[in-house]
């Protein structure tokens, strides 16, 4: 979902997160925030069009158990659409308190963790009023995941991976 300022935030963060990427294409829609379940048909049609147009190596989405209705629907549609792909469900520390123990971790170096924090804080101005949207929250979650995973650097991101093909 990206309309107005949120679309600008998405573009700015994608440019920074994906700097150096060989190719980048952003697809944004302007569905009403908080109403995704009521808009299932057009959203599912967009997912189907994306499936026909893209062949990603990995797909990142919200957790299927996310308590935010929009996030949960997007996760469900991701699994319905990209059945033969590696899907990593990411975490968001927020009001709903729905964090659990991830099943996959990616070690980060301290500079990478700080870069992520900087990009989030610099690019997502619309989220700054939220109590959970702080450098301390982001830093704490990455440190906790670093401890859980035993990452040598002490920093990691956690993901939920429901299906992983090794080899």
Q: How would you name each of these model-derived features?
A:
Residues 1-86, 94, 100, 144-154, ...:
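Active-site beta-strand->loop->alpha-helix modules in alpha/beta enzyme cores, enriched
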Residues 77, 134-138, 156:
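Residue-level signal for alpha-helical context at structural boundaries
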Residues 159-160:
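Short, solvent-exposed loop/turn segments enriched in Ser/Thr/Gly
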């Amino acid at each position: 979902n990206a309309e107005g300022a949120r679309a600008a935030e998405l573009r700015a963060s994608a440019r920074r997160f994906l700097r150096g990427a060989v190719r980048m294409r952003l697809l944004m829609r302007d569905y009403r925030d908080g109403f995704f379940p009521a808009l299932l048909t057009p959203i599912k049609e967009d997912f189907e069009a994306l499936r026909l147009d893209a062949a990603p190596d990995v797909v990142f989405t919200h957790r299927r158990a996310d308590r935010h209705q929009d996030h949960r629907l997007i996760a469900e549609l991701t699994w319905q659409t990209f059945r033969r792909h590696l899907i990593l469900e990411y975490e968001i520390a927020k009001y709903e308190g729905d964090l659990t123990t991830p099943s996959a971790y990616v070690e980060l170096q301290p500079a990478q963790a700080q870069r992520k924090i900087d990009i989030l804080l610099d690019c997502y101005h619309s989220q700054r009023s939220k109590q959970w949207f702080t450098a301390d929250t982001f830093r704490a979650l990455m440190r906790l995941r670093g401890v859980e995973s035993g990452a040598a650097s002490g920093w990691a991101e956690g993901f939920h991976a429901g299906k992983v093909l090794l080899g």
